[in-house]
């Protein structure tokens, strides 16, 4: 209601606005492009976020709360929905609307938008950190060997994290929902969590990709 999102004229190839921002309701997707490849940020993540939010009522079969609002009786369903809605969507829209300025540079809430601001960002892949910085050697020519550490991190995240969550918190949910619905729910939760995790890794360690396979157009 407050922020304008008009349907403007067709794009002019001879002129580009700076910052080139989508309407506010698409800025969440545009912000995802900072951290992921277009196929992941524009297709895979949004699809799984939507699937996860739609699947919540089918996974959580708790009959309590039908016809009335109660957080205490539907903690799992409401918490998952609010995480997907507020963290994975509204938070990204706020960043894109208020904190991204010219050249899609990050600005503070009251910082002046300087069109000539230059930010020295040296984003680096996990394979480069391990092979070049830590081991002091050149990058292997074999693609799988080069990215083996990143592949292990991805598999360990879904495998080990999933097992730890199941052991510590998931037994009760597993008994109530059954194996198929529980493991589908666990996969969706872990997959949705990859977005804030990747954002923090970029902010804290300037990490670009955990697995970088541009030869296969597969970067994670």
Specify the residue positions occupied by each region the protein language model found.
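Hydrophobic cores of alpha-helical transmembrane segments in multi-pass integral membrane proteins
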Residues: 1-66, 70-220
């Amino acid at each position: 209601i407050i922020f304008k999102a008009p349907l403007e004229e067709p794009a002019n190839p001879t002129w580009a606005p700076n910052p080139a921002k989508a309407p506010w309701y698409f800025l969440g997707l545009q912000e995802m492009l900072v951290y992921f490849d277009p196929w992941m940020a524009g297709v895979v993540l949004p699809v799984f976020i939507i699937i996860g939010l739609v699947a919540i009522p089918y996974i959580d079969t708790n009959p309590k709360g039908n016809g009335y609002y109660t957080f205490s009786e539907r903690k799992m369903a409401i918490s998952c929905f609010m995480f997907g809605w507020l963290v994975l969507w509204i938070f990204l829209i706020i960043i894109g609307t208020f904190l991204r300025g010219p050249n899609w540079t990050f600005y503070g809430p009251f910082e002046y938008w300087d069109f000539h601001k230059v930010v020295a960002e040296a984003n680096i892949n996990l394979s480069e950190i391990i092979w070049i910085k830590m081991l002091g050697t050149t990058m292997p020519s074999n693609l799988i060997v080069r990215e083996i550490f990143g592949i292990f991190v991805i598999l360990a995240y879904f495998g080990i994290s999933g097992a730890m969550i199941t052991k510590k918190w998931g037994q009760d949910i597993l008994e109530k929902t059954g194996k198929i619905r529980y493991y589908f729910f666990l996969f969706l939760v872990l997959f949705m969590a990859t977005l804030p995790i990747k954002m923090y890794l970029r902010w804290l360690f300037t990490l670009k990709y955990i697995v970088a396979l541009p030869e296969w157009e597969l970067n994670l």
